[in-house]
Amino acid sequence: MTVFPTLGLLFLCQLLATTSAQRVGPQGPPGPRGPPGPSGKDGIDGEPGPSGLPGPPGPKGAPGKPGAAGEAGLPGLPGVDGLTGTDGPPGPNGPPGDRGALGPAGPPGPAGKGLPGPPGPPGPSGLPGGNGFRGPPGPSGLPGFPGPPGPPGPPGLAGIIPEGGGDLQCPALCPPGPPGPPGMPGFKGHTGHKGGPGEIGKEGEKGSPGPPGPPGIPGSVGLQGPRGLRGLPGPMGPAGDRGDIGFRGPPGIPGPPGRAGDQGNKGPQGFRGPKGDTGRPGPKGNPGARGLIGEPGIPGKDGRDGAPGLDGEKGDAARMGVPGEKGPNGLPGLPGRAGIKGSKGEPGSPGEMGEAGPSGEPGIPGDVGIPGDRGLPGPRGATGPVGLPGPIGAPGVRGFQGPKGSSGEPGLPGPTGIRGESGDRGPAGVIGAKGSQGIAGADGLPGDKGELGPFGPPGQKGEPGKRGELGPKGAQGPNGTAGAPGIPGHPGPMGHQGEQGVPGITGKPGPPGKEASEQHIRELCGEMINDQIAQLAANLRKPLSPGMTGRPGPAGPPGPPGATGSVGHPGARGPPGYRGPTGELGDPGPRGDTGEKGDKGPAGQGIDGPDGDQGPQGLPGVPGISKNGRDGAQGEPGLPGDPGTPGAVGAQGTPGICDTSACMGAVGASTSKKS
């Protein structure tokens, strides 16, 4: 236990001894300022000191302006199709849409009739129609073959002869009489005249619809009709069942940076850190005052190049410069590299079910599906109500070709035809008589310049001509190429101190400092105390060994100014200067002698002159011979015509002839039905 107090006492004594030995005396008065010495070499950069404790957070800066919207990112890949959800309950039927336009007729169905449907139930009897008007007598038919002998009929009653007429009339009712002897088979009576068409009876009540017949053979798929008008939006259906969770989509575009957070609470004041290393040397001092100009000396001869001098000794360390004011804000840094893709996050909780969206527009009707297999016949359904009138049927079969129509009126003259190709060259015609002299044509364009002829012999010198007028100033020539860079000049005087820059953007708040504790103090000062104890122990073991190099002392006073040097040797030749601007054009020189006339050049190629005036109108042409054109192709079948109106009532026909045998046959048939 007594070792630690003694070591601590020795450590304190050593610290006091070292500090007292390195004390600096009082600073003397400043001496006169000497000429600036040669600039020393840059010292070796010291190692960066440990980062200091984070300072207190600054005040909260003003919110920044929102950044401009970034460019649109690349479109994401299409997502994987989700699983098909369960079908929702069918919605209520919407109101019937408007009737669409009639589509084109479909291709004919396969040959053959469909399977016959089962017979429907008999409909209710219609109301008896009114008696029709008797039509005109028809043409007499051919006599028929004699029929087989019929069974003996009952004896008939005595006929009634009406007054004023010789025609026999059938009684309203023929009651059966006692059986008579079998009579001879009679001959077939004369066929009566064909009666006229009776009056159209009233339309009977529509019978109850029969059961639906079996489905026929499915026809081929018809052409798709035009798209119908958009129907009224149906009522909103109930919300469907929730689908399965889809696959995770690609990551979206990163959003804009969030706003700066609120200023945090001020952290506890940190401990004072250890003293840092010596900083870098300060900026170079201002140049000294300019000396007096010496008398010009006699230029001496160029001396030989001297041997390179030895490197000078390292100068004293420069004093610490005054800390400069805060400079302007630096340029924005380069954009950082894209970060590593983050790990896949946990699947988010399923969101709440959203409200059902509005019904979408009705889709384009799809193609007719493949006909399915014939199903089993279902039970007979109840008789349904009378349906709405069906759509207009398909157009009828194409009619026969009608007779050839009369020739139509001559058509309008057609458009001018395309100019035909040039025909083969015809035989040479007979040379015609010489025509009258035409009007002189327009002057042709000047021909191309002929080739330069050979130079003639030099002629006699002519008289000197008069001095010509000063020509216009020529265009300024292009700038010459840039010369080699010159020798750098002397450094100029240091500029004035700049104005204080705009306060910079408040930095992000640093992490909160650690709380003051014994462990924290040991972490900061433990290594330094261990080094001091190790050095103290080494000095105690070797008291005669030289100690550590002390800190450099303060700079001494400047020395006296040196003598003025002699005139130096002339420097090396400088680089060539920049090319000057092009000078103005000089006065034109005297006119030269006229040369001899050259040889005649080759004939120039003429250029087609402009088109001449339009000639007089020619004689009328020979009238052409017209021919009937070919019959046009058969037109497409027309639309079905409107149903015709009922015709007028025909004239009343002549009274018919009643055959008693026919009446008897009718009575016999009625009795057989009753039995």
Swiss-Prot record:
Looking at the record, which segments are called Triple-helical region 2 (COL2)? 547-626
| Top-level division of the source organism's lineage | Eukaryota
Q: Which cellular components does GO assign to this protein?
A: basement membrane; collagen type IX trimer; extracellular space
Post-translational events:
Prolines at the third position of the tripeptide repeating unit (G-X-Y) are hydroxylated in some or all of the chains.
Gly residues: bias regions: 126-135
Name the InterPro entries for this protein.
Answer: Collagen, Collagen_Structural_Proteins
Q: Where is the signal peptide?
A: 1-21
- Provide the protein's localization: Secreted, Extracellular space, Extracellular matrix
Q: Which ranges belong to the motif Cell attachment site?
A: 242-244, 591-593
Q: Where is this region: Triple-helical region 1 (COL1)?
A: 632-658
Q: Where is the composition biased (Pro residues)?
A: 27-38, 51-60, 105-125, 136-155, 173-184
Q: Where is this region: Nonhelical region 2 (NC2)?
A: 627-631
Region Nonhelical region 3 (NC3): what ranges? 516-546
Q: Which residues are glycosylated?
A: N479
* Low complexity composition bias: residue spans: 62-87, 218-233, 361-374, 481-508, 569-582, 613-624
The segments labelled Triple-helical region 3 (COL3) in the record are 25-515
**Composition bias, Basic and acidic residues:** 301-317
Give positions of region: Nonhelical region 1 (NC1). 659-675
Q: Outline the segment boundaries, as ranges, of region: Disordered.
A: 22-517, 542-660
Q: State the UniProt keywords alphabetically.
A: Collagen, Extracellular matrix, Glycoprotein, Hydroxylation, Repeat, Secreted, Signal
Among the GO molecular function terms of this UniProt record, one is: extracellular matrix structural constituent conferring tensile strength
Q: Which family does it belong to?
A: Belongs to the fibril-associated collagens with interrupted helices (FACIT) family.
**Quaternary data:** Trimers composed of three different chains: alpha 1(IX), alpha 2(IX), and alpha 3(IX).
Q: Could you tell me what this protein does?
A: Collagen type IX is a minor cartilage non-fibrillar collagen. It is associated with type II collagen fibrils.
Q: Would you tell me the protein name for this molecule?
A: Collagen alpha-3(IX) chain
Q: Which organism is it from?
A: Gallus gallus
